[in-house]
């Protein structure tokens, strides 16, 4: 596959992916603000300006590598990424346990809405007889990026959105049992990395 095809593939996915992760994070912060936490608002993160949300690895390197790999192989693969998490202080929420559910669900909910809007855009293009390859592929990319991002974030493992939703739904004791194994595993990984690191 030539360079022009790789560039076209990146161009097709760039806008949908940037919208997907930017609106996902902004939705978290906006709902948190509605529920009483002003942290994201005070730090200027309630904006659709993607520069405020870009994570060098999650927004650029990982999606870029996936897109280039997909283009070189000639096969369509899953493309996903992530942005810098919007800072949220759950203690500031008016009803932390219940509001945490709404704040967590806002991100995947925003992705679902975007997937629907990209689907509508695709249907409009087809109904108008517009079969321009670039725009059709962009709409399809918009649907796939948002569905993948929504599905990954709904996995019920903290600190993913699904984990926070489950934690908010469970009674306090069971919620801790849901969170504790993840924290223990993370601590174990950190200890492993430290023990494997050379002494300076």
Give each language-model segment a name:
Residues 1-200:
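Hydrophobic transmembrane alpha-helices and their immediate loop junctions
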């Amino acid at each position: 596959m030539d360079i022009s095809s790789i560039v076209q593939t990146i161009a097709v996915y760039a806008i949908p992916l940037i919208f997907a992760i930017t609106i996902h994070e902004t939705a978290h912060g906006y709902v948190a603000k509605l529920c009483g936490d002003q942290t994201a608002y005070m730090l200027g993160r309630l904006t659709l300006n993607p520069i405020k949300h870009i994570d060098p690895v999650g927004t650029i390197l990982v999606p870029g590598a996936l897109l280039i790999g997909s283009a070189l192989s000639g096969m369509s693969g899953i493309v996903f990424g992530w942005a810098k998490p919007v800072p949220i202080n759950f203690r500031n929420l008016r009803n932390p346990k219940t509001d945490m559910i709404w704040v967590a669900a806002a991100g995947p909910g925003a992705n679902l809405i975007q997937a629907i809007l990209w689907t509508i855009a695709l249907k409009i293009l087809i109904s108008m007889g517009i079969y321009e390859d670039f725009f059709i592929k962009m709409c399809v990319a918009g649907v796939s990026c948002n569905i993948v991002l929504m599905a990954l974030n709904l996995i019920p493992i903290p600190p993913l959105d699904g984990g926070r939703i489950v934690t908010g739904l469970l009674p306090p004791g069971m919620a801790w049992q849901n969170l504790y194994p993840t924290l223990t595993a993370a601590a174990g990984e950190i200890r492993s990395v430290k023990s494997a690191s050379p002494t300076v």
